[in-house]
Amino acid sequence: MINWVRVALCGMLLVMVSLVLMPVQILCLWLDLKPRRWLPRHWHRVACLLLGLRVRVHGELDRRRPLLLSANHVSWKDILVLSSVADVVFVAKSDVKSWPIFGLLARLQASVFVEREQKRTTGHQVNDIGRRLADGEIVVLFPEGTTSDGNRLLDIKTSLFGAAASAVPQSPTGVVHVQPLAISYTGIHGMPMGRYHRPIAAWPGDIGLVPHLLGVLREGALEVDVDFGEAVDYDRHANRKEVSRLIGQRIRKMLSDRLRGRSRSAAKGEPAPACSAAPDIPSDAQRSRLAP
């Protein structure tokens, strides 16, 4: 009963915040005003708070532009998490437009929709992503092309990395920076989340969106770690397959280390640089002391 009361309250609060911010965002998109880039970040921070997503950030977002972020994909929650951390736009499948709730949110965030089955439109879509990169927008790409179980990185597809190549001629420095990042669901209710419980956070796609959303609302208190890795410079001499291989290697390493409780810096014997969007969350060391 208490869980359903929480679901209802969270839903009402999120609707109220949306009714305030959405008309402003629509106006900013229509008039091409600067707040269109950062307003979604505030909405997503509220959404993460209400859903019980506690986000910790490790490392730093690369300050150089153009910047393409390449991340592993576990769930629709990844969108909320990354959007609460930085002012980003996403590359999404065209059918996301028709999703309840999230389709509208994707359009309001000015996502780039691609039709992967329509090969003849691929060039136009890649050029659109390249133009957005050249305009200074931070574009997020999920190169796996689907969601995983949260325990591993699936094979990544190289085709959309062509967006980096298309933005190279428009870059003032002739370089596009491709930064890997890993999204790891590591805790639930303050306790470490093992492989067995990670499906609570993951959305593999064979479960309906609305039932999974309600399940997350009932559960709450999920801990998420976002690790930013070292960027790869993509210039006119770069090999797309080699860049995608290197990016995949770095994402896989960060994800594996985080799920095993090791940070990249700790593995190198360096202090771990971490900033938290939720300062009340215990550190990895504190949680390990609390764990049975």
Swiss-Prot record:
One of its GO terms (biological process) is lipid metabolic process. Keywords: Acyltransferase, Lipid biosynthesis, Lipid metabolism, Membrane, Transferase, Transmembrane, Transmembrane helix. Its main location: membrane. The keyword Transferase applies. Residues 258-292 are annotated as: Disordered. Its EC number is 2.3.1.270. Pathway: Lipid metabolism. Catalyzes the second step in the formation of ornithine lipids, which are phosphorus-free membrane lipids. Uses acyl-acyl carrier protein (acyl-AcpP) as an acyl donor and converts lyso-ornithine lipid (LOL) into ornithine lipid (OL). This is Lyso-ornithine lipid O-acyltransferase. It comes from Rhizobium meliloti (strain 1021) (Ensifer meliloti).
